[in-house]
């Protein structure tokens, strides 16, 4: 994840400046970027999986078969040299406004190319339960949303931000990466 470079930058800066310089917003940016990386990864994995279904190298799922396509592209799909590019464009277009961050949305995306019971299999792969994995991801997403939409302000103490430190961010990034790798492995 590119966000690891930002984490390293925070580490370098924190050793070179006094505590009077608040670097916590770098950490907050890392959380936002980490979730963004998972979202992007899920978009790419879904697009590629759906293209494999279209090409016949992966078994179609019910969700794939129900994926809506405009009638206007029917003619273009009959041309093998352009069909894949047309389908790819439609997938990108239909998914461009969707977010694949919440566990339910991620599972919906995976169902477009795989019949796997996603969170059960991810939990097994990671030696835990589906509930624990989804809860961990939801906590990360909730924190990301507090940062992105609420300026990470603690409503109990107006003007004060929720605490954050390098270890919390490192664990967050590790968990996101662990989940992404497990999703790849089980799909």
Name these PLM-found stretches:
Residues 1-32, 57, 61-62:
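Charged alpha-helical initiation segments
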Residues 27-34, 38, 42, 140:
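Short runs of predominantly hydrophobic/aromatic residues within well-ordered alpha helices
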Residues 111-146, 160-187:
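Amphipathic, Lys/Arg-enriched alpha-helical patches that create a basic surface
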Residues 8, 39-50, 142-156, 177-185:
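Charged/polar positions within long, soluble alpha-helices
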Residues 33-34, 41-133:
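Helix-loop junctions and short alpha-helical segments
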Residues 3, 10-13, 17, 116-120, ...:
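Short secondary-structure junctions and interdomain/linker hinges
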